Amino acid sequence: MTRAIVARAPTRLDLAGGWTDVPPYPEREGGAVCAVAITRYATAAAALDDRMARAVGVSVGSQDELTAAALRRARIPGSVASVVSDYPASAGLGGSSACGVALAGALAMLRGEALSQGELAALSRATEVEELRVPGGYQDHYAAAYGGGPIARNRFRYGGEPAPASLRA
């Protein structure tokens, strides 16, 4: 293996407005969420494996479906990826989104791309919603991509925005 990349993303606590970010609600009413990132993380590793040069991507470890979807979307020949976390599954902390953001970041760096936090959040959400058909909102991906807190947004169809720096932890 050559050129291994590691990235991590935090989970979040939803303080107010949960589920107002899940379509179709925000398109009709506008949603507002206050979430704060916490010190529980998903860590993703991605690498090129010369022995896998003809494979589009191989998933290794936990979160196999999400990892495989991220690899398909990245389209990096010979890439392998794995993701682990230090929080329990289905804990209501936005864990799959943290995994998705960490994977998106590691795979982007493996390609030599520098994505913005907003681009990482959008890519992670698109992978979950479009590839895996998981209906979901925006807050988890944006909290994982931006970290800190609070993350407050409105009119999610236009993406998410972090709160002003003066409000961030």
Give the role of each language-model region.
Residues R3-V6, I38-T127:
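Anion-binding (especially nucleotide phosphate/pyrophosphate-binding) glycine-rich loop
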Residues T2-V6, P10, A16, D21-G31, ...:
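ATP-dependent small-molecule kinase catalytic core of the GHMP/sugar-kinase superfamily
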Residues A16, A32, V60-D64:
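Low-complexity, intrinsically disordered regions enriched in charged/polar residues
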